[in-house]
């Protein structure tokens, strides 16, 4: 970049054919070769933007005049003949990235979690009456399935408690110390405390073991009966109460009911996000129902490089598919309440323009048939507030992800169908790949922060369960369309990435349990809050169970048994060991844990195993996945225990992973994360081997899994092993045998997007003419003229230019990007005075040129 010919260098950066670039050079007088103001005036001549003169405050704002011209050079096809362009009140070019706002009121009710306060308010007549919305016919239909659901859930409760009671009784007979009834606390009060401790300690440990066993077995039993009923449901193939059976699947969509596909994102893989979005858009277009749908990308990204990359990817998507005016993009400057706040902001601004909205995750892909089916289900079921599809996991290559894909694809349908069997229209909502009726969502599903202070107060983290509970509290159904195909997602590529996600989910589920006693919640959703907590609380309970069992073994081995527990006891109380009962109970527990997996494979065999690699390979894959789950279960147990304890103590668990180019876990990170588990496993194994080698065999699956945890974590994160399994047709899923066109398109567009990806987005927005024009046109801080604002702008620009680029913080970069004036002034200064800002120029010249033309 030469000071004396900066304008000529600038023209070289414009995406112009050689002939047009030459015409522009000849148009400039030689005296203006180093004058950016003259150049941008020349660029803007003849542009329609001349009708709206930019309110230029100084020569520094010269680049604002040519924003429209530069946009038309780079993305003319995506501007819909200029219809996508507009101006703000100061005449500055602005892209119409979002439709006109039509505001709706959305405010939350205050949480009343204290039942005594609610009782007192009801005495004072302050209760809020229910808000009915059903016709008499609809009420009859709902009462029918609600009665069936209630009966089914009572059956589940009886089965679970009965099974738990029998297992707990067996466990009681297995434990060695059986003299609890002979202990007399009054007698113990008169003897030395050490003797009392020696007598009581084994029985206290046994009591703790028994209580924990009952809780954990009940949890396992509930999962077993859920999977069993799902197996029967899928095997029969008929479900009278399936919501999918309420339409024939080819009804025309009501043109009065429009649907918004909204994708909240935050610092995601930009190339993958927009590849999946394009595949989904084109699939909807192929159904012939595109006019019923709009797409919204709602960004909460706070990485300036990613923000600029998102803007470029959005513009390219609109250009490639002709989606101008139908695909919208918004980046929030004030990130309130995370994902739920992002969705709430959409509902307040544009929600009342739509009857339904489909929530997509950043990795979601949905077929047009699935989306139109969800809309038809909403129209056929006017009492439904949320209909959740059952997303299938696919698209990953690491060994860890392939094991998880296989598990969710083979076992997942049983549990999902089982959940539907027990819950019917009072079901789960998982926060994505689901359709929501917008009006009741706006009226009833705004989330107030949890009252109080501490780690369990403030904005709700896991919003999906709470929104489903509020929707049901308002009288609307929440359904799972478990048999609806065409819904896809991706899983974390390795164990550590999954655990990062689990840390957030753990905290969110623990917070949600504060709503267990909130007024009006349906009992099923209270149970959902409980199961959400148990998903993570079961880990510390299991760990405590193992610790107490180990402590009991230590006491049994090292302490002399107390045979006489009363002063005049005639016969001693002998510790006993009944191995036949222990083996029977252990076998029963294994059956509850692994029979659902075997039933899943039987179901695959019954319906055809070809898409899973064949009958034999499915069985081998089952054994591999079972081995893998056994190795990972103790590792997850310890991590989840740390997450739960940290949440209760208010500790902030920092998890900063090193940057890596692929999904593989480096050895250094593996030993940092799993080192304490390895040491615990070694100490535990050595201690038990010294104490009683027989007990070590019972603990072997636990301790050896901990010892091997770093190695399992590293090797399972490698794509080479996963691809080797794929070549051997192991851990196969139908989406690999016969890939849906949406997933094939996603992979294709992902490769295309990687070829034209934008790295170092902020620097490109400062220097590159096309990217700068895009950033300026999409900047949202569009203030009217004010001297105070001008002073702040000047200070921000000056502070940035007086530093090296790497010294400008992300927050400062975001402020500069958000204002069309500041980002344009940066662009002007670095091109007008390259020798003054040599540090910026040198940093930019090291970067590859951005890909503008497809």
From Swiss-Prot:
Pathways involved: Glycan metabolism; osmoregulated periplasmic glucan (OPG) biosynthesis
Localization per Swiss-Prot or TrEMBL: Cell inner membrane
EC number(s) per entry: 2.4.1.-
GO molecular function ontology, one term from the record: hexosyltransferase activity
Enzyme class: transferase
UniProt keyword terms in alphabetical order: Cell inner membrane, Cell membrane, Glycosyltransferase, Membrane, Transferase, Transmembrane, Transmembrane helix
Membrane topology summary: Multi-pass membrane protein
CDD domains: Glucan_BSP_MdoH
Top-level taxonomic group: Bacteria
Main location: membrane
GO cellular component: plasma membrane
Transmembrane segments: 155-175, 209-229, 528-548, 583-603, 619-639, 671-691, 695-715
Alphabetized Gene3D superfamilies for the sequence: Spore Coat Polysaccharide Biosynthesis Protein SpsA, Chain A
InterPro entries, per the entry: Glucans_biosynth_gluTrFase_H, Glyco_trans_2-like, Glycosyltr_2/OpgH_subfam, Nucleotide-diphossugar_trans
GO biological process: glucan biosynthetic process
Family, as annotated: Belongs to the glycosyltransferase 2 family. OpgH subfamily.
Entries under PANTHER family matching the protein: CELLULOSE SYNTHASE CATALYTIC SUBUNIT A [UDP-FORMING], GLUCANS BIOSYNTHESIS GLUCOSYLTRANSFERASE H
Function of the protein: Involved in the biosynthesis of osmoregulated periplasmic glucans (OPGs).
UniProt protein name: Glucans biosynthesis glucosyltransferase H
Species this protein is from: Pectobacterium carotovorum subsp. carotovorum (strain PC1)
Gene: mdoH
């Amino acid at each position: 970049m030469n000071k004396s010919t900066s304008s000529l260098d600038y023209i070289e950066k414009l995406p112009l054919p050689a002939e047009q670039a030459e015409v522009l050079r000849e148009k400039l007088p030689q005296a203006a070769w180093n004058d950016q103001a003259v150049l941008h005036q020349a660029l803007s001549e003849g542009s329609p933007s001349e009708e709206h003169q930019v309110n230029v405050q100084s020569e520094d704002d010269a680049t604002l005049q040519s924003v429209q011209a530069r946009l038309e050079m780079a993305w003319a096809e995506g501007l819909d003949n200029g219809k996508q362009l507009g101006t703000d009140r100061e005449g500055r070019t602005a892209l119409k990235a979002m439709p006109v706002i039509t505001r709706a009121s959305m405010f939350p009710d205050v949480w009343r979690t204290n039942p005594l306060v609610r009782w007192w308010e009801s005495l004072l007549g302050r209760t809020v009456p229910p808000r009915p919305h059903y016709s008499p016919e609809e009420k009859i239909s709902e009462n029918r399935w609600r009665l069936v659901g209630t009966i089914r859930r009572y059956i589940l409760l009886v089965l679970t408690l009965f099974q738990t009671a029998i297992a707990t009784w067996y466990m009681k007979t297995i434990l060695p110390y059986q003299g609890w009834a002979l202990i007399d606390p009054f007698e113990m009060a008169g003897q030395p405390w050490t003797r009392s401790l020696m007598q009581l300690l084994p029985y206290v440990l046994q009591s703790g073991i028994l209580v924990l066993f009952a809780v954990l077995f009940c949890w396992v039993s509930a999962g077993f009966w859920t999977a069993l009923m799902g197996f029967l449901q899928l095997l029969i193939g008929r479900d009278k109460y399936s919501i999918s059976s309420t339409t024939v699947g080819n009804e025309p969509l009501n043109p009065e009911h429009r649907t918004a596909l909204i994708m909240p994102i935050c610092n995601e893989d930009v190339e993958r996000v927009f590849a999946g979005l394009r595949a989904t858009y084109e699939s909807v277009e192929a159904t012939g129902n595109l006019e019923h749908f709009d797409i919204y990308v709602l960004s909460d990204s706070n990485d300036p490089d990613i923000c600029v990359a998102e803007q470029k990817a959005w513009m390219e998507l609109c250009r490639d598919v002709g989606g101008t005016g139908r695909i919208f993009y918004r980046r929030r400057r004030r990130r309130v309440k995370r994902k739920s706040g992002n969705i709430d902001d959409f509902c307040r601004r544009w929600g009342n323009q739509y009857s339904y909205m489909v929530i997509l995750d950043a990795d979601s892909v949905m077929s047009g048939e699935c989306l139109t089916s969800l809309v038809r289900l909403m129209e056929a079921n006017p009492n439904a507030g949320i209909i959740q599809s059952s997303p299938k996991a696919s698209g990953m290559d690491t060994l860890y992800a392939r094991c998880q894909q296989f598990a969710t694809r083979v076992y997942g349908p049983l549990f999902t169908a089982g959940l539907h069997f027990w819950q019917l229209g009072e079901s789960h909502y998982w926060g994505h790949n689901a359709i929501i009726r917008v009006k009741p969502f706006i009226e009833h599903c705004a989330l107030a922060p949890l009252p109080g202070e501490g780690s369990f107060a403030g904005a709700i983290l896991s919003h999906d369960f709470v929104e489903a509970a509020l929707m049901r509290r308002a009288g609307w159904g929440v359904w799972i369309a478990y048999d609806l195909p065409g819904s896809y997602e991706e899983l974390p590529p390795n164990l550590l990435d999954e655990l990062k996600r689990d840390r957030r989910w753990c905290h969110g589920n623990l917070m949600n349990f504060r709503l267990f006693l909130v007024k009006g919640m349906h009992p099923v959703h209270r149970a959902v809050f409980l199961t959400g907590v148990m998903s993570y609380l079961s880990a510390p309970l299991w760990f405590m169970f193992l610790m107490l069992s180990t402590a009991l073994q230590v006491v049994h081995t090292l302490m002399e048994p107390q045979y006489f527990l009363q002063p005049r006891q005639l016969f001693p109380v002998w510790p006993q060991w009944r191995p036949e009962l222990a083996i029977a109970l252990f076998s029963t527990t294994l059956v509850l844990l692994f029979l659902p997996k075997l039933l899943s494979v039987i179901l695959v065999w019954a319906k055809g195993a070809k898409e899973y690699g064949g009958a034999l390979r499915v069985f081998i894959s089952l054994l591999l996945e079972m081995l893998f789950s056994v190795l990972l279960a103790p590792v997850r147990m310890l991590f989840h225990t740390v997450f739960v304890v940290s949440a209760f103590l208010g500790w902030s668990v920092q998890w900063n992973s090193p940057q890596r180019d692929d999904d593989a876990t480096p050895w250094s990170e593996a030993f940092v994360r799993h080192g304490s588990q390895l040491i615990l496993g070694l100490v535990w194994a050595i201690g038990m081997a010294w104490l009683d080698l027989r007990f070590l065999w019972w603990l072997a699956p636990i301790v050896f899994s901990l010892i091997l945890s770093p190695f399992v974590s590293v090797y399972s994160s490698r794509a080479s092993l996963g691809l080797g399994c794929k070549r051997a047709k192991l851990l196969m899923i139908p989406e690999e045998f016969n890939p849906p066109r949406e997933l094939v398109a996603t992979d294709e567009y992902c490769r295309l997007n990687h070829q034209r990806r934008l790295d170092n987005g902020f620097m490109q927005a400062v220097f590159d003419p096309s990217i700068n024009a895009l950033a300026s046109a999409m900047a949202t801080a569009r203030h009217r003229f004010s001297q105070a604002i001008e002073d702040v702008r000047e200070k921000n620009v000056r502070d940035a230019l007086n530093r090296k680029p790497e010294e400008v913080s992300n927050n400062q970069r975001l402020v500069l990007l958000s204002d069309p004036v500041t980002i344009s002034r940066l662009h002007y200064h670095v091109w007008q005075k390259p020798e003054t800002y040599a540090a910026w120029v040198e940093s930019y010249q090291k970067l590859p040129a951005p890909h503008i033309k497809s």
